[in-house]
Amino acid sequence: MNPLLILAFLGAAVATPTDDDDKIVGGYTCEENSVPYQVSLNAGYHFCGGSLISDQWVVSAAHCYKSRIQVRLGEYNIDVLEGNEQFINSAKVIRHPNYNSWILDNDIMLIKLSSPAVLNARVATISLPRACAAPGTQCLISGWGNTLSSGTNYPELLQCLDAPILTQAQCEASYPGQITENMICAGFLEGGKDSCQGDSGGPVVCNGELQGIVSWGYGCAQKNKPGVYTKVCNFVDWIQSTIAANS
């Protein structure tokens, strides 16, 4: 089933994944400054997450694309100006050339900041993966968004969830015919804990490396429907070559 249709069946206000906020269910409030690579993508409102991979580049999901984005770094309480945030406009927003919005394959994009971020205790980069993460690897998923599987409760403070990478067989069995080689699943087949559309674009970090980008899923924290994430290890060459060509 097409993920766009899945969202429509869920009663989403708009039957596209573009503006879906994250829904971390069964997680916990992150410690302040513990996820310094997490960014908020803003268009007058928070609409997606992302990850800072250098002082001038952010990686997110291609389905979060907007031609102009303000990247907000150093955020913790997203509703309050705490004084340590950096708000930097995008200079370039580059979707993967093979991004498929119908099946959400190659769901990755890069954002070049108009000026370099100042790196400090609240704003730091996350490493790209040196290899793909093995099934069973424990990862940290983070974002701001709905913490309820039904109904809405948008938290002010950044939310975290610890979740394992699932096997590709488990992933494909959960979503028959929908999983490509550029996707991984993470979470709990028994349900109860999940990032539901995740802060679309937000990070999945395993052992200090960015292994996933929140991409799509069916419902939130449902049994046998784990979150689906862009498999970042497949895109390291594209990320590096794109940055080099646009430096």
Swiss-Prot record:
PROSITE patterns, A to Z: TRYPSIN_DOM, TRYPSIN_HIS, TRYPSIN_SER
Annotated Gene Ontology cellular component terms: extracellular region; extracellular space
Binding site for Ca(2+): E75, N77, V80, E85
Signal peptide: 1-15
Compartments where found: Secreted, Extracellular space
Top enzyme category: hydrolase
Protein name: Anionic trypsin
The organism of origin for this protein: Canis lupus familiaris (Dog)
